[in-house]
Amino acid sequence: MWLLPALLLLCLSGCLSLKGPGSVTGTAGDSLTVWCQYESMYKGYNKYWCRGQYDTSCESIVETKGEEKVERNGRVSIRDHPEALAFTVTMQNLNEDDAGSYWCKIQTVWVLDSWSRDPSDLVRVYVSPAITTPRRTTHPATPPIFLVVNPGRNLSTGEVLTQNSGFRLSSPHFLLVVLLKLPLLLSMLGAVFWVNRPQWAPPGR
């Protein structure tokens, strides 16, 4: 009858001596840092980060070497902070395959069996898709049209129209103006010739 209380006490002691965030969420392409808090009695022990459904069979990814320096394995690094009674795990360049169950663990025994286990705490990692922003297409502004006139020179109508880059002599608007003005010009020329015609006096006067 003493076996069940002993196992329960062992489990509770391991769970209470180490505490992680429970769950964390990162974005694909970014980095994610997990803090795992522990009691002062575990300052000198190695800490490690493993992945799996169960803490007794999870696969170790990276672990400390008893020193306060960063240990790295691929995109995952770990560092112990004894002064803060915590160790941190950083996962860089996240992708959707990194989502799953992980464990903060402290190595207290070298040979694990059914009677002994390392303190551990489950951390569920979620990875959300990267946020992409649509590219904005910009169009160049239309340059303004300037009409440069020499003050010492009078430009004819044809020259003014030619210097305006927005108006062409072959455009329909120009042809329409010419067709409308041509009869008026011909009428004016006819009137001038009529007024200036020679006056012939009848013979005998």
UniProtKB/Swiss-Prot annotation:
- Location within or outside the cell: Cell membrane
Q: Which CDD domains match?
A: IgV_pIgR_like
Q: List the SUPFAM superfamilies.
A: Immunoglobulin
- Tissue distribution: Present on the surface of mature hematopoietic cells of the monocyte and myeloid lineages (at protein level).
Q: How is it modified after translation?
A: N-glycosylated.
- Please state every residue range assigned to the domain named Ig-like V-type: 18-120
Q: What is its main location?
A: membrane
Q: GO CC annotation: what is one?
A: plasma membrane
Q: What single Pfam family name could you report for this chain, choosing any that match? A: V-set
Q: Name one GO biological process term.
A: immune system process
Q: Which segments sit on the Cytoplasmic face?
A: 195-205
Signal sequence: where?
Answer: 1-17
Q: Which InterPro entries match?
A: CD300_family_receptors, Ig-like_dom, Ig-like_dom_sf, Ig-like_fold, Ig_sub, Ig_V-set
Q: Which residues lie on this side of the membrane: Extracellular?
A: 18-173
- Record-level Gene Ontology MF annotations: transmembrane signaling receptor activity
State the function annotated in the UniProt record. Probably acts as an activating receptor.
The family classification in the record reads:
Belongs to the CD300 family.
SUBUNIT field = Interacts with TYROBP.
Q: What is this protein called?
A: CMRF35-like molecule 2
Native species of this protein?
A: Homo sapiens
Q: What is the lineage of its organism?
A: Eukaryota, Metazoa, Chordata, Craniata, Vertebrata
